[in-house]
UniProtKB/Swiss-Prot annotation:
Gene3D superfamilies: Winged helix-like DNA-binding domain superfamily/Winged helix DNA-binding domain. GO terms for biological process: transcription by RNA polymerase II; transcription elongation by RNA polymerase II; transcription initiation at RNA polymerase II promoter. One of its GO terms (cellular component) is transcription factor TFIIF complex. Transmembrane segments: none annotated. It holds the Pfam family TFIIF_beta_N. It is found in: Nucleus. This is General transcription factor IIF subunit 2. TFIIF is a general transcription initiation factor that binds to RNA polymerase II and helps to recruit it to the initiation complex in collaboration with TFIIB. InterPro entries: TFIIF_beta, TFIIF_beta_HTH, TFIIF_beta_N, TFIIF_interaction, WH-like_DNA-bd_sf, WH_DNA-bd_sf. GO terms for molecular function: DNA binding; TFIIF-class transcription factor complex binding.
Length: 277
C-alpha cells in the first residue's frame, strides 16, 4: 500500500457484539468433494447428519452421514456417504468466528450503507474449542474415487493430437540467405592459384621480419596460397614448434634468420645454465 493510499484510508471504530462470545464452536475441515456439494445445496436443505457416540473413559466418536438430498444434486458423481471426524482440542490458541451484517433493504439502503459504513454490524459467533478433520471410510466407493483422482493427476498436460491437414508455420524457400552469402563470398575470393615458389618465399621472409612466430592461418592470409602448397614451402624454410610457449606456430630456420643478437643471448643463457649445473 502506497503512502497516498494510507492517507486516504479511514480507520473507523465499530462496536462488536459479544453476546455469543462464550459459545463453543467446532472448526471442521471437509474434503473438497463435500464442500462442492454443500455449495450447490440450497439454504434450507439438510446436508448431513452428525452422530456423537460417547463412551465413559474414551474419546467421543463423531461420524458424519451425507443426506440423500445432497447426493441427488449430481447423481452421476458417486462420492462416499459415511465419514469419520477426528477430534482435536484447541488449547494454546484463541480462535473465534466472526460475522458482519449490512442493511440491504433495496437500492437506497445499499447506497447509504456503502456511503455510511457505520450501519454495518459485527458479531462474534463463538470461540473455536475443537478442530475436526473429516475423512471418508475406506469403502469401494472411496477407492474408486481415489483411483479416478490419481488417473486424472497422472494424465499429461500436453497430448499428441493427430491432424488431418498440413500446418505450415513458415513458407518454403528455394535457398537460405546465409547459404547464398557464403557462396558469393567464396566466388569473390576466387580460387587460390599457386604463385612461384621464390615469390612465396619472399612474402614469407618479409612477414617474418615483422614477427618471429606465425600460425598457419595468418600465413595463408598473408600469402593467399593453398594451405597444402604453403606447408610444402614452410617445411623448407621454417621450423614447426611442438612445445610451449609457441606451440603449433612456425618460425624461420636458423640459417634464414636475421635476428642474430637474440640468438646469441639465448646461446649465452643456455651455456650459462649448463656451466652452473
Amino acid at each position: 500500500m502506497s503512502k497516498e493510499d494510507k492517507e486516504k484510508t479511514q480507520i473507523i471504530d465499530k462496536d462488536l457484539d459479544l453476546s455469543n462470545a462464550g459459545r463453543g464452536v467446532w472448526l471442521v475441515k471437509v474434503p473438497k468433494y463435500i464442500a462442492q456439494k454443500w455449495e450447490k445445496a440450497p439454504t434450507n436443505m439438510d446436508v448431513g447428519k452428525l452422530r456423537i457416540n460417547k463412551t465413559p473413559g474414551q474419546k467421543a466418536q463423531v461420524s458424519l452421514s451425507l443426506t440423500p438430498a445432497v447426493l441427488a444434486l449430481d447423481p452421476e458423481e458417486k462420492i462416499p456417504t459415511e465419514h469419520i471426524l477426528d477430534v482435536s482440542q484447541v488449547t494454546k490458541q484463541t480462535l473465534g468466528v466472526f460475522s458482519h451484517m449490512a442493511p440491504s433493504d433495496g437500492k437506497e439502503n445499499s447506497t447509504t450503507s456503502a456511503a455510511q459504513p457505520d450501519n454495518e454490524k459485527l458479531y462474534m459467533e463463538g470461540r473455536i474449542v475443537q478442530k475436526l478433520e473429516c475423512r471418508p471410510i475406506a469403502d469401494n466407493c472411496y477407492m474408486k474415487l481415489k483411483l479416478e483422482s490419481i488417473r486424472k493427476a497422472s494424465e499429461p498436460q500436453r497430448r499428441v493430437q493427430p491432424i488431418d491437414k498440413i500446418v505450415q508455420n513458415f513458407k518454403p524457400v528455394k535457398d537460405h540467405a546465409h547459404n547464398i552469402e557464403y557462396r558469393e563470398r567464396k566466388k569473390a575470393e576466387g580460387k587460390k592459384a599457386r604463385d612461384d615458389k621464390n615469390a612465396v618465399m619472399d612474402m614469407l621472409f618479409h612477414a617474418f621480419e615483422k614477427h618471429q612466430y606465425y600460425n598457419i592461418k595468418d600465413l595463408v592470409k598473408i600469402t593467399n596460397q593453398p594451405i597444402s602448397y604453403l606447408k610444402e614451402i614452410l617445411k623448407d624454410v621454417c621450423d614447426y614448434n611442438m612445445k610451449n610457449p609457441h606451440k603449433n606456430m612456425w618460425e624461420l630456420k636458423k640459417e634464414y634468420r636475421h635476428y642474430k643478437t637474440e640468438e646469441k643471448k639465448e646461446e649465452e643463457h643456455k651455456s650459462g645454465s649448463s656451466d652452473s649445473e
